[in-house]
Structure formats: C-alpha cells, structure tokens
Amino acid sequence: MELPESAWEQCVSSLQSELPAQQFNTWIRPLRVQQAEASNQLHLIAPNRFVLDWVNDKFKSRIDELLSSADHHPITSVEISVAPRRSTSFETNQGVAARQKRQQEAPRQNIASSQPSNSYSRQPQQPAVEMPAESQMAQVELLPAAPPAPLNNGYNTESFAQPYNDNPMGQGKVDKVDVEGGLQHKSNLNPTFIFDNFVVGKSNQLGLAAATQVAENPGGSYNPLFIYGGVGLGKTHLMHAVGNALCVRKPGAKVVYLHSERFVADMVKALQLNAINDFKRYYRSVDALLIDDIQFFAGKERSQEEFFHTFNALLEGGQQIILTCDRYPKEINGLEERLKSRFGWGLTVAIEPPELETRVAILKRKAEQVGAPLPNDAAFFIAQRIRSNVRELEGALKRVIANAHFTGRDISVELVREALKDLLALQDRLVSIDNIQRVVAEYYKIKVSDLHSKRRSRSVARPRQVAMYLAKDLTHHSLPEIGEAFGGRDHTTVLHACRKIKEMIESDADIREDVKNLLRTLTT
C-alpha cells in the first residue's frame, strides 16, 4: 500500500529539515515502513530496542503530528516496533553451536604454531593489494616480512593475529588466546584507551553511551555497533575501550581489533596460499571483531564478499561486531548495498567535533596525565584556536608542554602564543574575514558583494549575520573592524548579528547545521 509510505516520506523530509544531521541519521533514518492493513495506519520498524525507546520518547509526538497532517492521506494510527532478530547473546548455546559447526565443516589445513610475526613471508616489501580473482594470485605482491618460523604449508596463520597496530611504540597489550586448530587470537588493544579516561561532551555522549551498553551486553541489540565521524574524534578510543572492557568482563575472550586494510591483506595472502578456510575459521571464531575505517573496503569486491559472509556468521553466532567509519554507511561509495543495509541492523552513532567546553576538558585531562599544570586561560586559548579534532588539540598541547619544559617557564597564554606561533600564523592566514565571506557566499549561493551591500532580504541578511558571527568567533578583529569589512556597518550591527545567530544555533536546526558545516570548512 503506497499511501502510508508516501506519508512517511513526507514526514521524513520534514524531520530532516528540522533535526541536526546527527540526530536524523541516528534515530529517524534507520526506521523502515512495514506494510499496513489500512491507508490510515502506519507500522514502523526500528532496528533495536534502544532506537525504539529513544524515538518513542523524543520524536513520537512530532511524528504523529506530521503524519496526521500529511497531504491528501493523513495517518491516524502509528505503531513502532523492533525488527525480529536472530541470536542476541554474546555466548549463547546457539552461538557456540553455530561456531563449532562452522569450524567442523571448514576443511583443515596443516597449521603449525610459530612465534608471533608481523609478516607473512620473506617477499619484497610491497603494499597489500586487493585480490580480484584466484586466477590472478600469482601477480599479487605481499606485505613486508621478517623470516618466519618453518610452516608445514608455507602459511603463517599466526599472522592473522598481527592486525593493524595503532600503537607502534609497543604500549598496547597483545593477548593470545588459543583456539582449536592452532590459531592464536591477539587482541592488539591499547590498554590506555578505556572508558574512564574518555572525555565526554555533547558531541560524543551518545557514542559513549552506546559503547558502554555494548561492553555490558555484547552480542545484544546493538550488534553491530557502527560509529562514524571525522578523524581524531575518539572513534578508535571507544572501540578499544569496549574491547578492553570485554577482556576484563570475560578473561580469555577472543577480542580482535584491526584496521580494514589488514583484513584485506590477510584475505589476499590466504587466497594466494590456498588457505582461505583457515582465514574463515579464524575470523569467524572470535568473540568480538573490531574493525577500524571500514570505508577502505570500498571498491574491493572480493573483500566485501568475504566480509559479508563473516559478518553474517558472527551475527548468527551472537558474536559482537564494532565498526568505525569516517562517514554514514549509506554515503560510502563503492560499498555493496547489502553491506550498507546490514551495518544498520544494530545501532549507528555519530561522533561530532568537540565543542569548546569539551576541548578544554580534554586539554586539562591530558595535561594532568603528564603532570603539567595548565591554567584555565591557557586551556581556553588553545581550545578556541584548535577546533577540528582531538589529535590536533593534543599535538598543540604537546608543543606547549615541551616549550615550557625546555625554557623552564610556567604555562601561560603568552607562552602558548610563542609555542604555537607558526600554527596560529597559518590559521590567521587561512581564516581571514575575506576567506569567511568567500566561503559563506559559496555556501549560500550568493555573491560576496551581497554581503557588503545594503540589501536586507532574508536570503542575504541571514548569511551576512552568519558571516559576522564566524568572523567574531574565528578571528581577532574587533567589532568595528568586522563591521567595516561588511560594507562599513556599525559595531552594534555586528553585535546584534552575533547574538542573533548564537540564539538561533540553540533553536533552529537549519542554522545550527549551517554553522557547523561552515566551521568544518573553515577550520579543517
């Protein structure tokens, strides 16, 4: 029946314009329409109980309002329920049985135990290559290698236990867990990434809540957990925190963390050495599989095929999957639709760039960890200038602390200015009033000259106010200087514009999204 679906599409369109992108993508976008018995009824399916409860609590009344006033075919009855799921336990009897069945059915290769190695063979160093077909195996160049221990079939199966390492200094722990067949699972979790030292703010509180729930109830409703957001925002920290918590909760748990490119490299080598069954048995026998930067699967059809079956096997066995990505799953070009669909079966949460207060809290926490007193004014100064992500924030703090250490001075705003002068000078060149005006004009599809003009139509006045707000927020120019740059306006006009936009950011989702997008463009 098309009428309820048409009304829902109209409702979704309205909600998308009303809500911030993070809220819309997390709560509204995953909802699906189920066939209704009557034209005035609508049955929506939520992917899990968490989404169901949140939508009912926060958005149900607005959904009812929009659907009841839909054009031509109002909906008077709206029901939301949870999609039926298969296995939902971390270690259910069904999950264990399914895993044992897969292991028994997979033909065994000769597997020899060896000392852990970061490589597969003694071949020359080359990047990992996607394997399009078995007929091309001979052409594949392999990962760099150290001399491995002798293997019966030339295949170092322990290399599966050497995933992408985000901790090259060796601080991460590598936990081995023997499994049937001689393989060893190594978690490669960074022990410093735990929930206790994750700084929470508005930008990441949903991600933290979801990760905490997964750690307490792995393999449950939030499976898979898909965390997306820009670089350096804490996605990997949360992923490691869940893994570390699972290992504490269940000592000996087979928790494997790796980068998506490592999964590809393992599969390529397995294909070349005719050991694909070892590969399948290894990745499908874990308790939790944590894969970073899933967007690198894009365009790799053979890897996507194998991961698709691995994904299904793990969910069937009640084993937890956590994935991170730099964008919403539906926006990953080159990724099969069936994978995108499955990524939405659990819970999808976004991590946004931290707001000012969270950036200050992060700086204070990091400084405290290394025993460096950081005054509030210095912390706020750094946080106001470094906006894009936590990694850049930490990098700036390290420069400040090093400068204080080598000069024997206490940290102050003056010292921060000196330590970061190159970075601040670069920012001043990049974030100028002229640049702000150009970016805002392009964003709103108007001319820069319109921002200077006396025109007061809404299509020009609002972008002008946004540009003034950004100029005050991102530059050191005074209000009179900003007013002069916008057609010789009075400083009170600039002050009014800044106050107006600040209020609208709190109340208007469109303006809030516009300012967020413009800030991202101007500061990254």
Curated annotation (Swiss-Prot):
Sequence segments annotated as region (Domain IV, binds dsDNA): 405-524
Region of interest: Domain III, AAA+ region: 188-404
Region described as Domain I, interacts with DnaA modulators: spans on this chain: 1-73
Sites where the protein binds ATP: 232, 234-236
Composition bias type Polar residues, residue spans: 86-95, 106-126, 153-165
Keywords in alphabetical order: ATP-binding, Cytoplasm, DNA replication, DNA-binding, Lipid-binding, Nucleotide-binding
UniProt family annotation: Belongs to the DnaA family.
Full protein name: Chromosomal replication initiator protein DnaA
Organism: Saccharophagus degradans (strain 2-40 / ATCC 43961 / DSM 17024)
Source species taxonomy: Bacteria, Pseudomonadati, Pseudomonadota, Gammaproteobacteria, Cellvibrionales
Recorded name of the encoding gene: dnaA
